[in-house]
Curated annotation (Swiss-Prot):
The keyword Magnesium does not apply. It comes from Legionella pneumophila subsp. pneumophila (strain Philadelphia 1 / ATCC 33152 / DSM 7513). The active site is at C164. This is Octanoyltransferase. The record marks K130 as: Lowers pKa of active site Cys. The gene is lipB. One of its GO terms (molecular function) is lipoyl(octanoyl) transferase activity. Keywords: Acyltransferase, Cytoplasm, Transferase. The lineage of its organism: Bacteria, Pseudomonadati, Pseudomonadota, Gammaproteobacteria, Legionellales. Its EC number is 2.3.1.181. In the reaction, the free carboxyl group of octanoic acid is attached via an amide linkage to the epsilon-amino group of a specific lysine residue of lipoyl domains of lipoate-dependent enzymes.
Length: 199
């Protein structure tokens, strides 16, 4: 597993790089985890519906090829893209999603933030509020896209959409519990728990 820390990047640029990496990889290619933040952007998943974008203002909307519905990415949100050969690892997509949820819950528990999952609504929640999203694409047995964890960001753009297709879905973030939390530190813990699950 190769870990890349990419800083803050344009969504479309990284999306193209993920598709290119997945297209040219072979059975000997290492799996990779890309850690980054994005400039403000709304992304529509394959199941996304235009009516779930309520008020985009000046934020760009990108029609993506990941699973799921609409979400928002912006600075202060930790994004981890999972470029993994799940066929080689004998992993089903549902098992992978469950493991990613476990990793996110472990990170949050490290900070004593009580997290949970909800049946039929992938992602991780604190009470009824969503703190992390998951959206993947599988091509030729390999995944790309991944997870987004709200660390210390401006949550107001989420008010312009129905996050993940749920009207009135409230969002939260780690800084509500730890005002001085640093994204870089959270990223280190996420990598630690990720490598515990996936050697």
């Amino acid at each position: 597993m190769i870990i890349h820390n990419l800083g803050i990047k344009d969504y479309t640029e990284i999306w193209e790089q993920m598709k290119e990496f997945t297209a040219i990889r072979d059975s000997n290619s290492y799996d990779e985890l890309w850690l980054l933040e994005h400039y403000p952007v709304y992304t529509q998943g394959q199941a996304g519906k235009p009516e779930h974008v309520l008020n985009p203002n000046s934020i760009k909307i990108v029609q993506s090829d990941r699973g799921g519905q609409v979400t928002y990415h912006g600075p202060g949100q930790l994004v981890a893209y999972v470029l993994m050969d799940i066929r080689r690892r004998n992993l089903g997509i549902r098992t992978l999603v469950a493991k990613l949820e476990e990793i996110l819950i472990s990170v949050l528990e490290h900070y004593r933030i009580p997290a949970n999952i909800r049946s039929g609504a992938p992602g991780v929640y604190v009470g009824e509020k969503k703190i992390a999203s998951i959206g993947l694409r599988v091509k030729n047995g390999c995944t790309y896209h991944g997870i987004a964890l709200n660390v210390n960001m401006d949550l107001s753009p989420f008010l312009g959409i129905n996050p993940c297709g749920f009207a009135k879905m409230e969002m939260t973030q780690m800084s509500h519990f730890h005002p001085n939390i640093q994204l870089e530190e959270v990223s280190q813990h996420l990598v630690q728990y990720f490598l515990t699950q996936f050697k």
